[in-house]
Amino acid sequence: MLTPAELVWLIAAVAKGDEAAFERLYAATRAKLFGVVLRILRRQDLAEEVIQEAYVKIWNSAGQFNPALASPITWMASIARNRAIDVVRKKSESSIEE
């Protein structure tokens, strides 16, 4: 795992559209974020989809990251966790409607 300072630097580079920085960020954080998502969803197939969506959001939102408000991994885990919770809510809503 990279240091928080390195993660901050990578997120700043991602905000500028640096694909190599994004690949490095992904490689360094995927296992942790996948674990967060898998604990919520308990299904590997759904977790794979959610983690992809989370990284798209991380790519699109990197410019909004503020290291004064949260650590990089906390910010990224929040994005992944919130996306997983959205999926759980959607699944429970659809099962209620059925």
Role assignments for model-derived ranges:
Residues 1-2, 15-24, 34-53:
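Short, charged helix-capping/linker segments at alpha-helix termini
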Residues 3-9:
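Acidic, Ser/Thr- and Pro/Gly-rich low-complexity regulatory segments
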Residues 10, 21-22, 72:
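Hydrophobic side chains within well-formed alpha-helices
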Residues 11, 81, 85, 89:
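DNA-recognition helix of helix-turn-helix
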Residues 15-16, 39-42, 53-69, 90-92:
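Sigma70-family region 2
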Residues 26-30, 77:
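Amphipathic, non-transmembrane alpha-helical scaffold segments
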Residues 35, 49-56, 70-82:
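Structural recognition of an alpha-helix C-terminal capping motif at a helix-to-coil junction
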Residues 87-98:
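Short, basic/polar amphipathic helix motif occurring as a linker/hinge flanking DNA-binding modules
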